[in-house]
């Protein structure tokens, strides 16, 4: 009897993507985050769908509808906590996934990498419009400050801001369109994910050594499907611990107050996963310069494939590049910390050098280190 999963038109696609997919035999747990991101996306879409059934995108009732979900809807508190903390887990997996791509040279699959950067931008936009929906103080002022950045664009800036707002300030029209975008964009992300996977399966996965592995591949199932389930257990453990024991740990206390245009919070800050870019924005005194640096902080990822100069793909046996990578990681953690602090000394004087260091770390030392490592003495076995 012919195996149905290998002949059926639909099951054949699933089989080639998740069951009989040839995978390198030596990929480590760092390759787990792709599947975890897919699971995070499914969790966010499902919990978001149930939240959308009870949420009202009106400035007068949005805040109270979120309170109603938490108090009156069966397990509404759990769905909301899973959705809010699920976003944090999503970004944690996303940053680790990108970091693994840089460390092991996966960016040399240019199409897959570029689609990945598009995915990162789309997820960032989705998270931003979603943060506005509870219509608390930080939601309102975060939306006002962030959308106002478009006014730095010469000539068309102010028109663009008013077009985004749907009026002359952040109001009902803004909330309605942000809700529509927040509902729609996850499905765009799902579509881009399929494109990302299509390009990945054209080349096959990279591996820690960064060498071709066509001669030594194993089927994805059961080897890596079981391995991914272990990662999923860890993800669910952290997510449920957050959602059940400390649901507001990563949130902002100001968001427990309804939005008030007449009262500005003492310190406006976005969610933790935007803080590194927010710190770079704040470190530059010029508004247009800050906006350009904010965009460049993510778009610089598109340049990385063209800066690869080493003979070896992976950083596994490149000690100088490894050192620079971990300096960059420490720099990003510093920027995340600074972004959450008020604009005062000593945070200003720490944030500015960290912001200045971020771009040259990627642009100059990494290609130079690659060239230098090509001529390092090789061990004689």
Swiss-Prot record:
Entry annotated with the keyword Metal-binding: yes
One function term, GO molecular function aspect: ubiquinol-cytochrome-c reductase activity
Transmembrane parts of this sequence: 33-53, 77-98, 113-133, 178-198, 226-246, 288-308, 320-340, 347-367
UniProt keyword annotations, A-Z: Electron transport, Heme, Iron, Membrane, Metal-binding, Mitochondrion, Mitochondrion inner membrane, Respiratory chain, Transmembrane, Transmembrane helix, Transport, Ubiquinone
One GO process term, biological-process aspect: mitochondrial electron transport, ubiquinol to cytochrome c
Binding, heme b b562: 83, 182
Membrane topology: Multi-pass membrane protein
List of residues binding a ubiquinone: 201
Cofactor note text: Binds 2 heme b groups non-covalently.
Entry cofactors: heme b
Record has Transport as a keyword: yes
Binding residue positions for heme b b566: 97, 196
GO CC terms, sorted: mitochondrial inner membrane; respiratory chain complex III
Family: Belongs to the cytochrome b family.
Quaternary organization: The cytochrome bc1 complex contains 11 subunits: 3 respiratory subunits (MT-CYB, CYC1 and UQCRFS1), 2 core proteins (UQCRC1 and UQCRC2) and 6 low-molecular weight proteins (UQCRH/QCR6, UQCRB/QCR7, UQCRQ/QCR8, UQCR10/QCR9, UQCR11/QCR10 and a cleavage product of UQCRFS1). This cytochrome bc1 complex then forms a dimer.
Reported function: Component of the ubiquinol-cytochrome c reductase complex (complex III or cytochrome b-c1 complex) that is part of the mitochondrial respiratory chain. The b-c1 complex mediates electron transfer from ubiquinol to cytochrome c. Contributes to the generation of a proton gradient across the mitochondrial membrane that is then used for ATP synthesis.
Stored PANTHER family: CYTOCHROME B (PTHR19271:SF16)
Official protein name in the record: Cytochrome b
Source organism: Sminthopsis youngsoni (Lesser hairy-footed dunnart)
Taxon lineage: Eukaryota, Metazoa, Chordata, Craniata, Vertebrata
């Amino acid at each position: 009897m012919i195996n149905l999963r290998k002949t059926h038109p639909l099951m054949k696609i699933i089989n080639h993507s998740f069951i009989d997919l040839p995978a390198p035999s030596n990929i480590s747990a760092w390759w787990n985050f792709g599947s975890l991101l897919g699971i995070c996306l499914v969790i966010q879409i499902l919990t978001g769908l149930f939240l959308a059934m009870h949420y009202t995108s009106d400035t007068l009732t949005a805040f109270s509808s979120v309170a109603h979900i938490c108090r009156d809807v069966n397990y509404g508190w759990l769905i909301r906590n899973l959705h809010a903390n699920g976003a944090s887990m999503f970004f944690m997996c996303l940053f680790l996934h990108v970091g693994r791509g840089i460390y092991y040279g996966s960016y040399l699959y240019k199409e897959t990498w570029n689609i990945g950067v598009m995915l990162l931008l789309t997820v960032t936009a989705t998270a931003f419009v979603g943060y506005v929906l509870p219509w608390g103080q930080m939601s309102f002022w975060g939306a006002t400050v962030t959308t106002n950045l478009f006014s730095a664009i010469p000539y068309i800036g102010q028109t663009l801001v008013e077009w985004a707002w749907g009026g002359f300030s952040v109001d009902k029209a803004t909330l309605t369109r942000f809700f529509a975008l927040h509902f729609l964009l996850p499905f765009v992300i799902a579509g881009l994910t399929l494109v990302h996977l299509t390009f990945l399966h054209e080349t096959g996965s990279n591996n820690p050594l960064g060498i071709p592995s066509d001669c030594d591949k194993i089927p994805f199932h059961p080897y890596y499907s079981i391995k991914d389930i272990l990662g999923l257990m860890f993800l669910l453990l952290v997510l449920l611990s957050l959602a059940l024991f400390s649901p507001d740990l990563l949130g902002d206390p100001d968001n427990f107050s309804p939005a008030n245009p007449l009262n500005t919070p003492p310190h406006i800050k976005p969610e933790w996963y935007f803080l590194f870019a927010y710190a770079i924005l704040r470190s530059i005194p010029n508004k247009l310069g800050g906006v350009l640096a904010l965009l460049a902080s993510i778009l610089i990822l598109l340049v990385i494939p063209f800066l690869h100069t080493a003979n070896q793909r992976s950083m596994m046996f490149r000690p100088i590049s490894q050192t620079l990578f971990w300096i960059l990681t420490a720099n990003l953690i510093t920027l995340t910390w600074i972004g959450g602090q008020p604009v005062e000394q000593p945070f200003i004087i720490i944030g500015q050098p960290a912001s200045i260091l971020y771009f040259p770390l990627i642009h100059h030392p990494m290609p130079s280190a690659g060239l230098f490592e090509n001529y390092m003495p090789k061990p004689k076995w």
